[in-house]
């Protein structure tokens, strides 16, 4: 295999994609991958950053926004992914050993016993020039690595990040979006960054009116808030019902984006695939959490 790019981030991205594909499709033979040339051998992992908490604010009673700073954030704006994998210090792993680049070009962990737990979160707002970004955390009961960390986060705390991760958003003239609290940061970012001419409708489900937050919507997408008002998250069908009720316009490029509890995501995905015959190039329906599972 040969990879070539004019920029180190691009080269690292290509090598990562190629090595991942080889490991997946040739997993039975388990070939050894050893790169030569630039960015070869063990060393600093290009997609890793050690981030520092700048400040923590309460957006709503159950949503915190944490601003983090880190060096060289250009790659997080270059590859289209909205998300990052966050590596959290915990009581059981208070001093993590961070990942490095292995000889195969992929993530390598020098000490598995000090490998931190990780979860995927959305970059809510990214300021490359300022060297900082915001991540919104839903604070909730039960065991949750991300929620527990965010609840205790203070200025100066450290956390690792890998990324960006996730499928890039395809350009479209019209969108239908649906999200509960877990997908809300991504919807907010999209509404603040898509072209002003973008049309469509976005449904956002939250616990009650107190959880509604300000979104600087720069598009022509209509935003509708849905309140559970006492219904437990994951039990209401209102969000999926609303998204599935939308008629897609003809003669414009459309895109469907949905992120919520697993059962709701499956309903919407099945509707888009089976009832409307829409493919992966036109839709994303993701399970951001599963009812009954610890986070």
Describe every region a protein language model picked out.
Residues 2-295:
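Extended, composition-driven regions rather than compact fold-specific motifs
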């Amino acid at each position: 295999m040969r990879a070539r790019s004019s920029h180190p981030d691009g080269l690292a991205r290509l090598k990562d994609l190629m090595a991942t594909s080889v490991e997946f499709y040739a997993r039975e033979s388990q070939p050894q991958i050893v790169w030569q040339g630039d960015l070869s051998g063990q060393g600093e992992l290009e997609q890793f950053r050690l981030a520092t908490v700048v400040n923590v604010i309460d957006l709503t009673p159950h949503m915190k926004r944490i601003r983090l700073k880190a060096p060289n954030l250009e790659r997080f704006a270059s590859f289209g992914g909205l998300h990052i994998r966050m590596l959290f210090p915990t009581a059981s792993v208070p001093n993590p050993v961070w990942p490095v680049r292995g000889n195969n070009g992929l993530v390598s962990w020098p000490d598995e016993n000090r490998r931190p737990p990780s979860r995927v979160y959305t970059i809510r707002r990214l300021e490359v020039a300022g060297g900082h970004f915001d991540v919104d955390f839903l604070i909730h009961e039960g065991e949750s690595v991300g929620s527990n960390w965010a609840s205790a986060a203070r200025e100066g705390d450290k956390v690792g990040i890998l990324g960006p991760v996730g499928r890039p958003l395809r350009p479209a003239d019209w969108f239908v979006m649906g999200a509960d609290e877990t997908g809300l940061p991504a919807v907010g970012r999209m509404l603040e960054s898509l072209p002003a001419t973008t049309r469509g409708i976005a449904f956002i489900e939250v616990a009650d009116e107190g959880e509604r937050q300000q979104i600087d919507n720069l598009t022509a997408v209509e935003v509708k808030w849905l309140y559970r008002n006492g219904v437990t998250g994951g039990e209401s069908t209102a969000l999926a019902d609303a998204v599935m009720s939308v008629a897609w316009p003809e003669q414009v490029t459309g895109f469907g984006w949905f992120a919520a509890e697993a059962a709701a995501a499956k309903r919407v995905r099945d509707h888009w695939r089976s009832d409307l015959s829409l493919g992966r190039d036109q839709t994303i329906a993701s399970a951001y959490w599963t009812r009954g599972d610890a986070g």
